[in-house]
Structures are given as structure tokens and as C-alpha cells.
From Swiss-Prot:
Sites annotated Cleavage: D460, S461, L490, C491, L530, G531
Record note on domains: The 9aaTAD motif is a transactivation domain present in a large number of yeast and animal transcription factors.
Full protein name: Sterol regulatory element-binding protein 1
InterPro entries, alphabetized: bHLH_dom (IPR011598), HLH_DNA-bd_sf (IPR036638)
SUPFAM superfamilies (UniProt xref): HLH, helix-loop-helix DNA-binding domain
Gene: SREBF1
Residue segments, region Disordered: 39-193, 421-479
Residue positions where Phosphoserine is found in the record: S98, S117, S337, S338, S396, S402, S457, S1060
Regions of compositional bias (Low complexity) in chain numbering: 62-71, 78-95, 170-190
Length: 1147
């Protein structure tokens, strides 16, 4: 089989393929290639004399000198010395060569005969030597070096086989015709001189697993002699062509037939136990062809190629090979350790130190992160490029910030940037007629019609990937909308056209005949005669002109309304650039609201409105224009014209998707306006009353235009916020608009859902409506901290108004009990307790629908959908209801509410004010004496009363300038404690009736402990009456009771009771002052005074004998109307006692 030419390219190609050799084998191959390439310096004087011949020719193989027989086995010394001399000769200078000729056909290679029997473990390899012949001697130029060799004693070749190796038939030729020279193979670095047939040495190694044959360029280098062949051969220059064989072992052989020695360099492996048999080399010379077999030892392990060294340095070479492998292993270990450390460091940078990933996953994550950084860097470069281009346009800093901050103009700006960048970075064509070619510096290719890259292999520039990948995100022309100044200017123009009516003037001026038409003048040489006026004027124009003018005016108004409401409204399509900016700022506003950063939340909401194409006014002119436009728009929407046109915002075509997007855009803008209005009302957003009014009207108009996209609760809340703004910002003369907006909210709820949201049901109640419209209250910027209700959402003003209304209900209920209507003939006198229970029931419903403390700060949520329970207000309502039920002697209803009052809410427990604890202990004392569980009567109830009295005194001492509701609660608790102590004293009275003949001294007095406690509570009541005048009525009654308990003089007691029995008014102008200093007693106080006077005063203080029974009967009738069954029961018991002793008294 023909062998390919031997070159370095073939070697590199073979080395590039996968193999089982390790890095040491590749290193040795590179070292050997370096030795081969540097053959000039390694073997100086190879072709110097005395080996150089005449230079023109050599010994002809066909001459008689070369055909004489001779011995084939010269002495070994001669052969060895001849080979050394041949290898040490210098290289001759190259001579000009002729052009190359066609390559000769080499002779076939035949295996050797099996006469040689190698030992075990040794394989036999045949090395046939074939002489390549060519007809004409034409060497290659620059590739072959002519050599000349000396002609020693010519040995004779024998045609008979040597050493039992028969000559294969027709296989070898040993000579060439006279005068012919041989041409070496092209590509060989070393060639025979002209006239000398080159001999190629073919080595074939058989192995168990066939490997790829590696061939390298051979240099005349030889290892120490391992095999010596003694033969008597002819002096024939032999082309040494050793072959590197990639197999289980590697062999490099070189032979030279110079009549002296033949050297075979075998590269033995470093593996211990590898032996090479050094015996006589079986050689067959037949017709000038040398066939040699070399026994080799093939090892199954990997065998590195050793450096060529002398035979005497074999131990040192083996030692260096071991040191080299050790060093190589250390290098590999350091290399792998460095790789592992860098991979671990890369993992820590990309995914963190806690993650557990393999090397492949770490590299994959790193690649993804690098791509993300590249994409981010590209976006930043694009933004930087856009900013630089905007700066080059000589824009001011304000315009630049506004252009970059507005989401709607970002894409338009980038389009202009892209065009300018392409024009800047793309050089012009060389001439006008040449086609446009994309420059390598250009960011995008315009040569392609599709806008892609100029070539198929080059991708588009990543600067404009976003604009190419998402072309649908560019905002359309109608989505930008009109500014409020433009809207107001258009409205002003329409108003001027309708008021001045320029169309009528214009058409009327054209319709009237001109003077040249009415009067004609005839010129003649003599006289000028005036023509007569034409009386046949166009009468039809007078009737047709007004309808045409009004038709044109109506068309102008219609076109203006369409421009304002249909094509002037900004519509933000989903997944567009402005929509992305809007939701980004809105989500950030939600986060800022949750953190309590209200100023930053207001800034984010402002940017969100800019993204929607609805920027807030920044100057006074813009604010005035925006406010006037919103007023005009609200009036038009009340006429249903504006609302019908706004429902078709974006276009008059029947596009359902566009209408849905327009409604959603209006809803989002309305919610943002509403939240900004709430922040402004709570003092979290800067601006005056005009700014707040503008925000309220904008939210209301857009919410009405959104239609079904806005929930009923949200729409009602926006109406209530507008009513709140009217009451807060507008003068009192315009407060009637509050009723209008509240009515609109109620109608909106009832028309769509049929029910009012729970958080706004109190607005539909007459009491709540009256409180909202006529109440004297104001919204504070800080949450209202109170003991009687919890604060709601701090950014919702309606939650604060609801909290104020709950406290108002509690105060009204307390006033019904402690200070009812003083008019004796009032129709409401018998409804004091029922009115109080009605207020408390409304308070409970408001407490159940109040905003929970864990409110939601989302812009889309509202108090209308977020409900909770106010436990504090509910506890106070339950306490007041329990006391009222005890006074009405409705013990079953009181017991149902007692479990709610027994446990004080956590907020009141953590409070430092003693008033809640005083209320709790007062309830416990009243329950022990007035309730069903009367087992704790006596000393235990007195102990509870003492605790309650102590907390009440602390409350009066710590809060001298308390609010009206605090004073009402303190009066309620103080009166309750005095009633409990009075009931305890009455229970200790004997059951016998009080005869009229007995004096007060005969009645049992209260103990010192009871009197001391009663005086303590009475002093608290006097202290409260100094700042709260309605408490003075109770002071007179309880002071008379204290004198009765102590058995004091009845004269002073009668005077105190007389203040409650007689209703005196001041004379004339002093009546108001007297009424202010001494409040008129209520009907309950009058009945209580009658009961005390008839029961405990001596008979001498009564005017008639039957007056006691009459007083008791009158007191019973009054208490029955009031519904105080407790005192009514005591009065009836006294009447029964007096009925048995009437005869004694009258007699």
C-alpha cells in the first residue's frame, strides 16, 4: 500500500486527533520535532569531506564495480565507524534544481519469511527496502540537497537469498539502467545524491489493538546501537526514513548501508521489565533490495518517547524521566487546584456561598449572568447614547429630564436617536451612483429592505434590539392626548365663535349686494346718468342664512367635543411602554405607602400620571386651566354628553378592545388622582385648596368615564371624597354641594348593586348624614389618638371622619343618660333611654365595619372593601348599654352584654390613662349591687367602689382640660358610683314604712366608711361641675342624699331638694344668666327629688297631710314615662307602705 508523503502538516493533523497518550507523550513529540527541525545545528559537517564526492555523480549501481560479489558481513568495527563518519559529515550547499517531475511508483512491500523465530513476547517486524526509480534525473528545486559519498571497496551484491530468506518473485529490483539517476519523493527533506537510488525503510508494527500510524520527518539521528548486522554490502546511500508508530509501544529505527555498520535505534519504554533482544539482524539482500526484520518488545502500557541520548547515559536518562513525570504530576495538580479554586470563587460571585452546584452548573450560571450583564450594559449604552444625542440638540436640562422621564416620548426619542446615530456613524458612499453599503461602524444596516443586517451572517446591532423586537409598543398618535391648556383654549375658541358668531357676519356680508350691483353709473361724453336700484333682491338668502349659520356652529361644537373627549383623551394600551412605566411607578408607590414614606409615594404617583400622559399642573396658569377644564367637563358629563363621548375615547370606530383599554386607562388614572387627593387631604402632599379641588374633580370625572371598569365601592368613595373636599376647601355658602355629592354616591350604590358598602352605611343614616353635612369637625394630618375608638387608615380621610362619628355617637348616648332634655313637657322625655340605645346600636354597626388596624395600602383598595372591627368603641358602647339596661331593670339584656365588658381591650390595658380602669371597676361595683349577681353586696362591693373612686380621682387630676366626651364619661362614671352607694345604703334600711310622725333622727345612719366613700365621690362630682356645668344639677341631688345618709339637719336638706323640685327662671334679661349659672333640672332629677322628700323628710316640711302620697304618685308617673324601672319599683314599694299607714298619718 502506498504511503503518503511525510511532512509536518501530516504530523500536526495526526496529533490533533484524540489519542490515549497523556501530556508527557505530547511533550516528547514536540521535543523530537524541535530536534528534527534543528538538524543543521545538531549534526554539523554531515556532508563535509572526506564523504563528499565530486558533486556531480556517484557510483552507478549498474556498473561492474558495484556488481562484483563480496562478503555481506564486514567487521563490526568498520561498519560502526563508517556510520559514525557518515552521520558526522557536514551538509553540502544546495545547488539549483530542476522543476519536479511526476512522483515515481514505489515497489510493493512484502512481509518477511518466517525463518526467524523470535522469543516469547517479541513480535517480528519486516522492514522492506525498496528503491524508487524514475526515468530522468530531475531533482526538486529548493527541496533536495545533492550529496557526494566516497567510493570505498565496492562490495558485490548477491542475488541469492541470505539467511534463508528467499527473494520474493518480482518483488524487488536492485539496479537501474546506466545513465539513469533516481529522483526522490517530493516533500522529503533529505534525498540521495543524483545517481544514487534512495532506499525507503518501511516499518510495520503489529499490535493487539491497531492504532493510527504517525509519520514524522526523519533526521539522521540515531540512538545507541542495539542491533549490529555484519554484512558485506555495496556502498549504497540509503534514505533513512524512520516511522513513528502509535501503538502499544513506539519504535524508531534507522538503517544505513554504508558497508560498515547498520544501526537500529529502538526507543525502549521506561516501564520496568521491558527488554529488547539484541541479536544478529536477519537481513535479505536481493537485487539491491534490503529486507530486514527487527525484533521488538511491545508493552501494553503507555510508552513516552524519550529524548535521544547516548547508550552510556541510560541510567541517568531513566532517572530524568522519573523526575520529569513527578514534576509533570505536580504541575498538573497545581493546574487542577487552580481551576477548582477559580470555579469555587466564580460560584461564590454568581450564586452565593450557600449554593451547591457542580462545575457545569456554575459555568452555566456564570454564562447566563455574563449575558445578563452584557444586556444591561447594552441598555445603559443605549440610554447614554440617547442622552448624548439629546444634549447635542442643545436642549436644556429641564427638557432633557422631562423627555427622559415621560414614558410616552421615550420610544419617539429613541427613533430620532437611531436615525441620527446611523447618519453620524455611517460614512457616505464613494460616489453618488454607487449603491449604499453598510459601514462596519454603523449601528444598523440600511442596505437591506427589511431593515435587517446587510449580510446574512452578521446579526443586527443590539442597540436597537428592543425597538425591532417590540414594534407594537410604540405609542400611537391618539394615545398621547391633549394638555389641559389646549383643551381650555379650544373651549374658549368655541365659546367665542358661539358668542360673536363670526360665521353669520361673514356669510351675511357676502350675501348682501354690493354698491356696484345696486347702482350703475353710465358714463357719456356729455352727462352721467345714475341707474336705478334693483328692487328684486335675493329674498331666499334671508331665510336660508340663519339655519346654515346655526348648522355650522353646531357642527363646530360637535367637532370640538369629539376632539376633546374622543381624540383628546390619552389611551394607554396594555403591555406598551407607557403602561410599563405606569405600573412600575404605581407598584413603587404601594411599597412607599406600606413603609410610611408618603412623600416618596406622592412623587411616584406623580410620575405614574406622567406615564399615562396626564401630567399634573406645575404652574399657576396650568392649575387654573386644569381646574376650569375639569369644571366644564363635569358639567358636560352631568348632561350625559361628555360621558357618552368619553365612552368612545380613542376613536369613533367600533373597536371593543380599544374601548376596554380606554376604560382601563381612565380607571387607573382615576385611582391615582384619588390617592393623591387623599394624601393631600391628610397633609401628606403639598399644594393648596385649588390643587386639592383639581385632584378631586379629575378623579371624579375619570371615574365616571371609566364606567363599569370602576367598582361601585370605589366610585362611591370618590364621590364622598369630593363631598369632603367641598366641606373642607369651599366656603360655607357652597356647602350645599356636599349633599349633592353624597346623594350621588348613594344613588350610584343603589343603582348598580342595590346596597351600600358597610364602611359608608352610616352616611346613609340620618344621624350620619347630619353629622357629615352640619357637624363641626375637621380632618387632621396626624391620626386621631383616642381612648374611645381606634384610628383607621392614616391616608384615608374618610376613615378619620368615621372615627369622629363613632365618638360622636358615644357622646350622644352618654348625654341621653346623664343630661337629658331639661324641658318637662318635651315629647322626647320618655325616649331618653331608647334614644341612647339607638345611638349605641348605630355605634356597634359602625364599629363592626370600621377599618382594621392592619389596613391595606394598595392604591386599588379602599376602605369600602376593607372592613374590620373597632374593639375599643364596641367596648364603650357595651358598657353604656349595660348601665342603661340596669337602670331600666332589664337584667337579661344586661347579662347578655356583660361578657363583652368584663375583659378590657388590649389597647386600653396598655394605655397610661386611668379612665378605662375606673370604668371597668365601676362596672364591677354596679354589677354587684344592681345586677343579678348580688352575692357580693356589702364590704366586697364597697372595696370595688373604693378602687373605682381612686381611678376616677386620678383621671380628673391628670386631664383637667379634657374634651367634651371625656367630661361626659367622667360624669357618667361618677354618677354611677354615687347611685351604687345610694342603693347600698337603701338596702340597709329596715323594711318598716317611714311614718310621718317619726323624725329623721330615728332612721339608721350610714357607717363612717360609707359616708367617707360617698363624700369622696361627691367631691369628684363637684370638681367636675366646675368645668362642666351640666354636672351641677346632679351635685344638688347627691348632696341632699349625703345629708340624709349622715342624719344632718333637714332644713339644709330641704333647701337642696327644693332646687330640684322648683324650676325657677331668671327675671327679664337676667334669665339667661341664671339659666347658665343654675341649669334647670331634668324630669328624672325632679322625680328623684320627689321620692327622697316624700320618704325621708319630716312631716313638718310638708304642707298638707296627703302631700306625701301625691308626691310619690307624681314621681311614679314620671319614672314610668322615663322608663326608669329601678326607681319606679322603689316608688311603688313606698306607696304600698304608705297605704297601710295613711290612717295613722291623717288622724
Amino acid at each position: 500500500m502506498d504511503e503518503p508523503p511525510f511532512s509536518e502538516a501530516a504530523l500536526e493533523q495526526a496529533l490533533g486527533e484524540p489519542c490515549d497518550l497523556d501530556a508527557a507523550l505530547l511533550t516528547d513529540i514536540e521535543d523530537m520535532l524541535q530536534l528534527i527541525n534543528n538538524q543543521d545545528s545538531d549534526f554539523p559537517g554531515l556532508f563535509d569531506p572526506p564523504y563528499a564526492g565530486s558533486g556531480a555523480g556517484g557510483t552507478d549501481p549498474a556498473s561492474p564495480d558495484t556488481s562484483s560479489p563480496g562478503s555481506l558481513s564486514p567487521p563490526p568495527a568498520t561498519l560502526s565507524s563508517s556510520l559514525e563518519a557518515f552521520l558526522s559529515g557536514p551538509q553540502a550547499a544546495p545547488s539549483p534544481l530542476s522543476p519536479p517531475q511526476p512522483a515515481p511508483t514505489p515497489l510493493k512491500m512484502y512481509p518477511s519469511m518466517p525463518a526467524f523465530s523470535p522469543g516469547p513476547g517479541i513480535k517480528e517486524e519486516s522492514v522492506p527496502l525498496s528503491i524508487l526509480q524514475t526515468p530522468t534525473p530531475q531533482p526538486l528545486p529548493g527541496a533536495l540537497l545533492p550529496q557526494s559519498f566516497p567510493a570505498p571497496a565496492p562490495p558485490q551484491f548477491s542475488s541469492t537469498p541470505v539467511l534463508g530468506y528467499p527473494s520474493p518473485p518480482g518483488g524487488f529490483s536492485t539496479g537501474s539502467p546506466p545513465g539513469n539517476t533516481q529522483q526522490p519523493l517530493p516533500g522529503l527533506p533529505l534525498a540521495s545524491p543524483p545517481g544514487v537510488p534512495p532506499v525507503s525503510l518501511h516499518t510495520q508494527v503489529q499490535s493487539v489493538v491497531p492504532q493510527q500510524l504517525l509519520t514524522v520527518t526523519a533526521a539522521p539521528t540515531a540512538a545507541p546501537v542495539t542491533t549490529t548486522v555484519t554484512s558485506q554490502i555495496q556502498q549504497v546511500p540509503v534514505l533513512l526514513q524512520p516511522h513513528f508508530i502509535k501503538a502499544d509501544s513506539l519504535l524508531l529505527t534507522a538503517m544505513k548501508t554504508d558497508g560498515a555498520t547498520v544501526k537500529a535505534a529502538g526507543l525502549s519504554p521506561l516501564v520496568s521489565g521491558t527488554t529488547v533482544q539484541t541479536g544478529p539482524l536477519p537481513t535479505l539482500v536481493s537485487g539491491g533490495t534490503i529486507l530486514a526484520t527487527v525484533p521488538l518488545v511491545v508493552d501494553a502500557e503507555k510508552l513516552p518517547i524519550n529524548r535521544l541520548a547516548a547508550g552510556s547515559k541510560a541510567p541517568a536518562s531513566a532517572q530524568s524521566r522519573g523526575e520529569k513525570r513527578t514534576a509533570h504530576n505536580a504541575i498538573e495538580k497545581r493546574y487542577r487546584s487552580s481551576i477548582n479554586d477559580k470555579i469555587i470563587e466564580l460560584k461564590d460571585l454568581v450564586v452565593g456561598t450557600e449554593a451547591k452546584l457542580n462545575k457545569s452548573a456554575v459555568l452555566r450560571k456564570a454564562i447566563d449572568y455574563i449575558r445578563f450583564l452584557q444586556h444591561s450594559n447594552q441598555k445603559l449604552k443605549q440610554e447614554n447614547l440617547s442622552l448624548r444625542t439629546a444634549v447635542h440638540k442643545s436642549k436644556s436640562l429641564k427638557d432633557l429630564v422631562s423627555a427622559c422621564g415621560s414614558g410616552g416620548n421615550t420610544d419617539v426619542l429613541m427613533e430620532g436617536v437611531k436615525t441620527e446615530v446611523e447618519d453620524t456613524l455611517t460614512p457616505p458612499p464613494s460616489d453618488a451612483g454607487s449603491p449604499f453599503q453598510s459601514s462596519p461602524l454603523s449601528l444598523g444596516s440600511r442596505g437591506s429592505g427589511s431593515g435587517g443586517s446587510g449580510s446574512d451572517s452578521e446579526p443586527d446591532s443590539p442597540v436597537f434590539e428592543d425597538s425591532k423586537a417590540k414594534p407594537e409598543q410604540r405609542p400611537s398618535l391618539h394615545s398621547r392626548g391633549m394638555l389641559d391648556r389646549s383643551r381650555l383654549a379650544l373651549c374658549t375658541l368655541v365659546f367665542l365663535c358661539l358668542s360673536c358668531n363670526p360665521l353669520a357676519s361673514l356669510l351675511g356680508a357676502r350675501g348682501l349686494p354690493s354698491p356696484s350691483d345696486t347702482t350703475s353709473v353710465y358714463h357719456s361724453p356729455g352727462r352721467n346718468v345714475l341707474g336705478t336700484e334693483s328692487r328684486d333682491g335675493p329674498g331666499w338668502a334671508q331665510w336660508l342664512l340663519p339655519p346654515v349659520v346655526w348648522l355650522l356652529n353646531g357642527l363646530l361644537v360637535l367637532v370640538s367635543l369629539v376632539l376633546l373627549f374622543v381624540y383628546g383623551e390619552p389611551v394607554t394600551r396594555p403591555h406598551s411602554g407607557p403602561a410599563v412605566y405606569f405600573w412600575r411607578h404605581r407598584k413603587q408607590a404601594d411599597l412607599d405607602l406600606a413603609r410610611g414614606d408618603f412623600a416618596q409615594a406622592a412623587q411616584q404617583l406623580w410620575l405614574a400620571l406622567r406615564a399615562l400622559g396626564r401630567p399634573l399642573p406645575t404652574s399657576h396658569l396650568d392649575l387654573a386651566c386644569s381646574l376650569l377644564w375639569n369644571l366644564i367637563r363635569h358639567l358636560l358629563q352631568r348632561l350625559w354628553v361628555g360621558r357618552w363621548l368619553a365612552g368612545r375615547a380613542g376613536g369613533l370606530q367600533q373597536d371593543c378592545a380599544l374601548r376596554v383599554d380606554a376604560s382601563a386607562s381612565a380607571r387607573d388614572a382615576a385611582l391615582v388622582y384619588h390617592k393623591l387627593h387623599q394624601l393631600h387631604t391628610m397633609g401628606k402632599h403639598t399644594g393648596g385648596h385649588l390643587t386639592a379641588t383639581n385632584l378631586a374633580l379629575s378623579a371624579l370625572n375619570l371615574a365616571e368615564c371609566a364606567g363599569d371598569a370602576v367598582s361601585v365601592a370605589t366610585l362611591a368613595e370618590i364621590y364622598v371624597a369630593a363631598a369632603l373636599r367641598v366641606k373642607t376647601s369651599l366656603p360655607r355658602a357652597l356647602h350645599f354641594l356636599t349633599r349633592f355629592f353624597l346623594s350621588s354616591a348613594r344613588q350610584a350604590c343603589l343603582a348598580q348593586s342595590g346596597s351600600v358598602p358597610p364602611a359608608m352605611q352610616w352616611l346613609c343614616h340620618p344621624v350620619g348624614h347630619r353629622f357629615f353635612v352640619d357637624g363641626d369637625w375637621s380632618v387632621l394630618s396626624t391620626p386621631w389618638e383616642s381612648l374611645y375608638s381606634l384610628a383607621g387608615n392614616p391616608v384615608d380621610p374618610l376613615a378619620q371622619v368615621t372615627q369622629l362619628f363613632r365618638e360622636h355617637l358615644l357622646e350622644r348616648a352618654l348625654n341621653c343618660v346623664t343630661q337629658p332634655n331639661p324641658s318637662p313637657g318635651s315629647a322626647d322625655g320618655d325616649k331618653e333611654f331608647s334614644d341612647a340605645l339607638g345611638y349605641l346600636q348605630l355605634l356597634n354597626s359602625c364599629s363592626d365595619a370600621a377599618g382594621a388596624p392592619a389596613y391595606s395600602f394598595s392604591i386599588s383598595s379602599s376602605m369600602a372593601t376593607t372592613t374590620g372591627v373597632d374593639p375599643v368603641a364596641k367596648w364603650w358602647a357595651s358598657l353604656t348599654a349595660v348601665v342603661i339596661h340596669w337602670l331600666r331593670r332589664d337584667e337579661e339584656a344586661a347579662e347578655r352584654l356583660c361578657p363583652l365588658v368584663e375583659h378590657l381591650p388590649r389597647v386600653l390595658q396598655e394605655s397610661e390613662r386611668p379612665l378605662p380602669r375606673a370604668a371597668l371597676h365601676s362596672f364591677k361595683a354596679a354589677r354587684a349591687l344592681l345586677g343579678c349577681a348580688k352575692a357580693e353586696s356589702g364590704p366586697a362591693s364597697l372595696t370595688i367602689c373604693e378602687k373605682a373612686s381612686g381611678y376616677l380621682q386620678d383621671s380628673l387630676a391628670t386631664t383637667p382640660a379634657s374634651s367634651s366626651i371625656d367630661k361626659a364619661v367622667q360624669l357618667f362614671l361618677c354618677d354611677l358610683l354615687l347611685v351604687v352607694r345610694t342603693s347600698l345604703w337603701r338596702q340597709q334600711q329596715p323594711p318598716a314604712p317611714a311614718p310621718a310622725a317619726q323624725g329623721t333622727s330615728s332612721r339608721p345612719q350610714a357607717s363612717a366608711l360609707e359616708l367617707r366613700g360617698f363624700q369622696r365621690d361627691l367631691s369628684s362630682l363637684r370638681r367636675l361641675a366646675q368645668s362642666f356645668r351640666p354636672a351641677m344639677r346632679r351635685v344638688f341631688l347627691h348632696e341632699a342624699t349625703a345629708r340624709l345618709m349622715a342624719g344632718a339637719s333637714p332644713t339644709r336638706t330641704h333647701q337642696l331638694l327644693d332646687r330640684s323640685l322648683r324650676r325657677r327662671a331668671g327675671p327679664g334679661g337676667k334669665g339667661g344668666a341664671v339659666a347658665e349659672l343654675e341649669p334647670r333640672p331634668t324630669r328624672r332629677e325632679h322625680a328623684e327629688a320627689l321620692l327622697l322628700a316624700s320618704c325621708y323628710l319630716p312631716p313638718g316640711f310638708l304642707s298638707a297631710p296627703g302631700q306625701r302620697v301625691g308626691m310619690l304618685a307624681e314621681a311614679a308617673r314620671t319614672l314610668e314615662k322615663l322608663g326608669d324601672r329601678r326607681l319606679l319599683h322603689d316608688c311603688q314599694q313606698m306607696l304600698m307602705r304608705l297605704g297601710g299607714g295613711t290612717t295613722v298619718t291623717s288622724s
